[in-house]
């Protein structure tokens, strides 16, 4: 029995399913989840001392690679001054100033402790600002696990094979309208009918929770136009895409300014952090300035601010994101070449330093239906074959992959060598 198998058996005694987030259980790919004990650079090391090139990156935050010395040093320095104060700190203001200088649409920002908390708070704020109740989201897009958002969600819920979650009251769900991703005509039709009741549209500008589906040409532009027309708040959920697709996030890359944005993952440098922000007029409705209440004991935690500030400063250097995107493109080109050579139907998607892998004969992946038509069973086999070759992919056919600046030519070769063997075995 491996150490991971023994630890998983032990974990199931007191942790539901043996994990603290469902996708980690390997339910969609089969087998025993790996338990990791160390991570450094582009690698993770499991409890049996096997090293893997890591394309999960803690589900996105580790854009610098694991254990970047500058980030670790900043956290160590803060440790000497205490873990949490429950009071304002200078670092919170520095973080707010930096985020607002980087992200095109941000005029004010509020720190929270997770991406779920950020999206939940942004929606509450949009409702308070507009005085409307309904929200629009898109099929297969995941915005955290708050009740009103677990309606035809993506990510872990796709992995489980269910469209929603038990325990969500019908009264919550009735205010959530779900439309097809990348279908602006559906948005136009819905807003023409009920636009006066809709507080906000929330969207992943790149859908990263049904693997990785970039926006179709004109989709984000159409959302901006329709929200302006109907007085609807446009929220970009940039928890995944923020600071990764480009320094300014997806909104910086695609040139579309939302009214509100939510962030997580990279903004905390690996610590539990989220934030939301946007137009000053809307943010002025949040307490203590306005009537929309939001609070958090650990919001703006000094350890998290130290890690996040250091990370954002490091990734702001000229050329950083061009290097990341280039590595990602070279890796995906190499995978496609090897799949084609093996005669395996395979297509990749990319948005900067995030990517999707699909076993599909489609020319491109644009819709939720395209995602669901891909061969998840073949992905299961591929996942385990890549593990055997020393490459750790997300343990789900519906999760995006992530690269880091620590990935280089050596890691690329390991990845492509493993993939060549895997594709040959999948014929």
UniProtKB/Swiss-Prot annotation:
<dbReference type="InterPro" id="IPR049704">
    <property type="entry name" value="Aminotrans_3_PPA_site"/>
</dbReference>
<keyword id="KW-0627">Porphyrin biosynthesis</keyword>
<dbReference type="Pfam" id="PF00202">
    <property type="entry name" value="Aminotran_3"/>
</dbReference>
<comment type="similarity">
    <text>Belongs to the class-III pyridoxal-phosphate-dependent aminotransferase family. HemL subfamily.</text>
</comment>
<comment type="pathway">
    <text>Porphyrin-containing compound metabolism; protoporphyrin-IX biosynthesis; 5-aminolevulinate from L-glutamyl-tRNA(Glu): step 2/2.</text>
</comment>
<keyword id="KW-0963">Cytoplasm</keyword>
<dbReference type="InterPro" id="IPR015421">
    <property type="entry name" value="PyrdxlP-dep_Trfase_major"/>
</dbReference>
<dbReference type="InterPro" id="IPR015422">
    <property type="entry name" value="PyrdxlP-dep_Trfase_small"/>
</dbReference>
<keyword id="KW-0413">Isomerase</keyword>
<feature type="modified residue" description="N6-(pyridoxal phosphate)lysine">
    <location>
        <position position="265"/>
    </location>
</feature>
<dbReference type="GO" id="GO:0030170">
    <property type="term" value="F:pyridoxal phosphate binding"/>
</dbReference>
<keyword id="KW-0663">Pyridoxal phosphate</keyword>
<dbReference type="InterPro" id="IPR005814">
    <property type="entry name" value="Aminotrans_3"/>
</dbReference>
<dbReference type="GO" id="GO:0008483">
    <property type="term" value="F:transaminase activity"/>
</dbReference>
<dbReference type="GO" id="GO:0006782">
    <property type="term" value="P:protoporphyrinogen IX biosynthetic process"/>
</dbReference>
<dbReference type="GO" id="GO:0005737">
    <property type="term" value="C:cytoplasm"/>
</dbReference>
<dbReference type="GO" id="GO:0042286">
    <property type="term" value="F:glutamate-1-semialdehyde 2,1-aminomutase activity"/>
</dbReference>
<protein>
    <recommendedName>
        <fullName>Glutamate-1-semialdehyde 2,1-aminomutase</fullName>
        <ecNumber>5.4.3.8</ecNumber>
    </recommendedName>
</protein>
<dbReference type="InterPro" id="IPR004639">
    <property type="entry name" value="4pyrrol_synth_GluAld_NH2Trfase"/>
</dbReference>
<comment type="subunit">
    <text>Homodimer.</text>
</comment>
<dbReference type="InterPro" id="IPR015424">
    <property type="entry name" value="PyrdxlP-dep_Trfase"/>
</dbReference>
